[in-house]
Design a protein with these regions (language model features):
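N-terminal, positively charged regions that mediate nucleic acid binding
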Residues: 1-53
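Glycine-rich, N-terminal phosphate-binding loop and its surrounding beta-alpha-beta segment
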Residues: 43, 47-122
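A short, glycine/Asx- and small/polar-enriched loop/turn
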Residues: 77, 209-213, 267-271, 353-359
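Glycine-rich, mobile lid/loop segments that gate access to catalytic sites or pores
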Residues: 106-247, 251-252, 257-265
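Short, hydrophobic beta-strand segments
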Residues: 18-20, 81-88, 213-226, 307-313, ...
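N-terminal, Lys/Arg- and Ser/Thr-rich interaction peptides
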Residues: 1-18, 142-156, 210-219, 292-306
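Internal helix-turn-beta structural module
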Residues: 335-399
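Long, well-ordered mid-to-C-terminal structural blocks that present hydrophobic/aromatic surfaces
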Residues: 237-304, 313-336
Length: 399
């Protein structure tokens, strides 16, 4: 394990920029559906005859190709959007069919019911399961027994991948992420849209210079709920005032925040941000896994980012998923235990034992944190307590 004290906390930089693609953004939907399918398949394997997570990766989910026209108070569906679940997935175990098309379809439908609640499967959106078993490794995706799933007993790094995580979130990151979360009601078992007239394809962008944070939030109104241009502008002004108050509370005096919602309200080229069903997949936009938020729910170009997107990858052994979650857990734990900002870097060569990672780098700010021996003992203890895949089989809605 390597420990250095050379990190400059991102909040100490003179300029910081952060973006979040909201839950209804096409890329975020693709990430979420891929993850939901992987977790549903993993749970089915653990609860059923295999008793272990079988080989799969569904990290190439594609969404798009819909077409809906909109006008004040109405819309017309011309072509449904499509969710194509691309990847590979074990189709049988010991000769018994696992029903993977049903698992894929039901998992995607459940996820869409939460984060794209205005879409109706089979009507405005179509789900196309498409996981194959093509490979040059015999019985890899059609195992006759767990002897054909060697990683069930001896998990090895499936790839040479670098994963990095950071804690805590900077004030800018906190405001940008939580501002989109504020558009959801988190009081139940699953989140629900807070406003019945607001769509889910939201993007929040923050630009900080010194203590001044400018936030631009692109928030769609549902066209059926908008009676006129004047009604649109009035609702946007109301949303802007409400989100400004939330942003001020989130900043808690650490930043001076200016929040703007759909700021272009007049002039040549003006275009209202209205959607019929809440996501731009309805008008030709496309979503693909790995093009959006990192595991922490943000896009921050000033922080190093993992080389792998974890969404849809096997939670039992895929390096880019396991190390992504482990790095974030370690960063959170170090910050909680010692009260310092830190970055955690993890990697292992392909084929090496998965846990513990062969290479661990903990980076702290100069002059901060515990001694090297105390930090090493703590990190090794936390790594030993990490369970694969158990710690990863949780639907992390707020990520």
């Amino acid at each position: 394990m390597h420990i250095s004290r050379t990190m400059t906390p991102v909040q100490d930089l003179p300029v910081e920029t952060v973006e979040r693609k909201g839950f209804g953004h096409p890329d975020t939907l693709a990430d979420g559906i891929a993850e939901a399918v992987s977790l549903a398949f993993s749970r089915a394997c653990l609860d059923g005859a295999p008793g272990a997570v079988l080989h799969h990766n569904v990290d190439k989910v594609y969404i798009g190709a819909g077409h809906i026209t909109r006008r004040y108070g109405a819309h017309e569906l011309l072509k449904p959007a499509v969710v194509r679940i691309n990847g590979r997935m074990s189709a049988s175990f010991a000769g018994e069919d696992l029903g993977i098309e049903r698992i894929q379809t039901e998992a995607a439908e459940r996820y869409l019911s939460v984060f794209a609640p205005h879409y109706r499967v089979g009507e405005s959106i179509v789900i196309e399961p498409n996981a194959t078993q093509h490979t040059n490794r015999p019985d890899w995706f059609t195992p006759k027994s767990l002897d054909d799933v060697p990683d069930a007993k001896d998990p090895r790094a499936s790839d040479t991948a670098l994963c990095v995580a950071h804690a805590p979130a900077s004030p800018t990151e906190h405001v940008v992420r939580e501002l989109e979360y504020a558009l959801w009601d988190w009081s139940g078992d699953t989140p629900r849209p807070r406003f019945c007239d607001v769509g889910q394809d939201v993007k929040v962008f923050g630009w900080r210079e010194g203590r001044t944070l400018d936030v631009t939030a692109c928030v769609p109104l549902l066209s059926d709920s908008v009676a006129s241009h004047d009604a649109y502008q009035e609702r946007i002004r109301h949303l802007e005032s409400e989100l400004q108050g939330i942003a001020d509370t989130l900043a808690d005096g650490r930043l001076d925040v200016r929040t703007r919602v759909n700021p272009t309200t007049s002039g040549e080229g003006y275009r209202e941000y209205m959607l019929a069903l809440g996501s731009c997949i309805e008008c030709g936009e496309e979503g693909v896994v790995g093009r959006g938020n990192a595991l922490n729910g943000l896009i921050n170009p000033l922080r190093p980012r993992s080389m792998e997107s974890p969404f849809g990858k096997n939670p039992a052994y895929h390096t880019g998923k396991v190390y992504g979650h482990l790095a974030q857990q370690l960063a959170d734990d170090v910050h909680a235990r010692f009260g310092v900002a830190c970055s955690v870097w993890l990697t292992s060569p392909n084929g090496f034992p998965l846990l513990p990672p062969r290479n661990v780098w903990i980076e702290l700010a100069p002059g901060e944190g515990p001694g090297d021996r105390e930090l090493t003992d703590f990190v090794q203890e936390r790594m030993a307590a990490f369970q694969v895949p158990g710690d990863l089989l949780v639907q992390r809605f707020r990520r």
